[in-house]
């Protein structure tokens, strides 16, 4: 059993090795085909690809680690292609080709990574163009190369002597591409970019020795499957943190920042925050009028019962104005001074300052004579909301009729006592300051001052 398992394991390892070797062979074939196409489809005579590899052994017996420093890497011949020379006659066929001879010597060369012209081009990831003789337009090109870089490689001298006119070095992929031509080929940036793209994509597809070398020598490079999955982030805090109750529960899959619908955070979908304290003696900010309170559900009547008690207090005290309201000597309050409607102020605050229950009955009688109807509750006039609604209806009814307010002359004050009881309720004995604020009303309101009004207007 153990022997069969070991044999099976060996067979699996052999299968993995065969796959790696076949992949490497396919990569080498693709590289050679690319180098060949560069020479056959252009004016370049030869093409060589130098790969970056670590030195096998250092002095002392210790293996050098990849990437420690530039001295541990080198440029080594990987593959090359040289186009055969076209013989002009049959005698030259058997003759030796000097270009091919110089090309063959390149296969045994080694260059230090980051040193010299070849090493610096590879480390700096750039490209260089070198000509045999400077042209007329570039007379100082040789001096430029000599000053900015190290001296040209000594084997390039043999190449120039064999007939090579242009040498180009381009960093591409995991190595360096060297091209040589027997013609003068000007520098072309588009060609450089095309070569880089071709050899980089070729290297990533075929998986050259260098990529396998780095992944195997480092040993700690993580694979895509070893990366942990993205951890789920905790949900962000709620947008509305109401004190006193838990945040609303969102449906599954819904984000707190993007609710499922517009009603998610609607005011009606959450309870209102409690008032600070919450005692019974503490008044709320808003009070509903008695008419609206009568329409409330039964379970809300008990809650608002203690709120309506302060509202009914002015009725029990004869319609007196609230203590916080300012009064002028003529009896007008701050509210009536702003609105300019003294007859409505009488409905609110009454004609006198301390009439007691009699003033309350006078206010009710004046409300019936003014056309408001006896069926309505007098408390409605104590609410600012109902008062404003009644005032608007009175203005719309009297918009087409004549109405003016004048100060009652002193000599006519005695005649007002013989008027109908409905008007005497509104002209009850009052301080002299308030008698000056009395009004004349139109015929539709009482029918008692029509003759006086016409006489006064004439």
Swiss-Prot record:
* Pfam families in the cross-refs: bHLH-MYC_N
Summed up, the tissue specificity of this protein is:
Expressed in root tips. Expressed at high levels in the meristematic zone and at low levels in the elongation zone of the root tip.
Chain intervals with Gly residues compositional bias: 1-17
Q: Does the keyword Transcription regulation apply?
A: yes
Question: One GO CC term of this entry?
Answer: nucleus
Knockout phenotype, as recorded, reads:
Defects in root growth.
Biased-composition ranges for Pro residues?
245-262
**What span is annotated as the signal peptide, if there is one?**
none
Q: What is its main location?
A: nucleus
Q: What does this protein do?
A: Involved in the repression of jasmonate (JA)-induced genes. Forms a ternary complex with TIFY11A/JAZ9 and BHLH094 to negatively regulate JA-responsive genes. Involved in transcriptional regulation in the root tip. Plays a regulatory role in root cell elongation. Regulates root cell elongation during salt stress.
What quaternary structure, including any partners, is listed in this protein's UniProt entry?
A: Interacts with BHLH094, BHLH089, TIFY11A/JAZ9 and TIFY11C/JAZ11. Forms a ternary complex with TIFY11A/JAZ9 and BHLH094 in the nucleus.
> What is the protein named?
Protein RICE SALT SENSITIVE 3
